[in-house]
Regions:
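A short, conserved, highly charged catalytic patch centered on acidic carboxylates
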Residues: 1-95, 103-159
Length: 159
């Protein structure tokens, strides 16, 4: 099973990408949106974006880290926020998610609220489950898909 010493790109990213793609299928949005891995905005490399297939605008940015502490880190929250700030004109909705697959936080960027904690949406830190609580990576992917399904649904509903 996955652990905190595993490669972020080699282990964490494939699980996250599978969960995001599964989420789009669960929501019936796979013809409207796609998951893109390692998309650049200027010199910054975003882990994932969900892109509108027609407009090429980003529904949200997903930044993946390895530990729960990293999800709670202001530094990494600011890093994820900076991607949305840099994507002016490319953003369909100003949302970003920071996750280590066990924990996740959804944010909505607002230039009037400069601090990431001011952009954090309820319920704040979501607990998907501890790695050791899952039988295998498929079970983790399924649980993560449920979190993303609710989260992406919230984003899509925001007009």
């Amino acid at each position: 099973m996955i652990n905190y010493n595993d490669s972020e790109v080699g282990v964490y990213h494939p699980i996250c990408e599978n969960a995001l793609n599964k989420t789009l299928r669960l929501l019936g949005q796979e013809r409207n949106y796609r998951v893109l891995h390692h998309r650049y905005t200027g010199s910054l490399e975003m882990d994932f974006v969900i892109e509108n297939i027609t407009t090429h605008k980003y529904l949200c940015v997903i930044e993946v880290k390895r530990t729960p502490a990293a999800v709670n880190s202001t530094r990494y929250q600011f890093q994820a926020m900076s991607y949305v700030q840099s994507n002016v004109g490319l953003t369909e909705k100003p949302y970003y998610i920071l996750t280590n697959l066990e924990r996740a936080i959804l944010f909505r960027y607002d230039s009037a609220r400069q601090r990431t904690y001011q952009q954090m949406l309820q319920p704040g830190l979501s607990i998907i489950g501890d790695f050791q609580s899952f039988a295998d990576e498929n079970a983790l992917c399924d649980a993560l898909s449920i979190y993303f399904k609710d989260t992406i649904n919230t984003i899509l509903a925001d007009d």
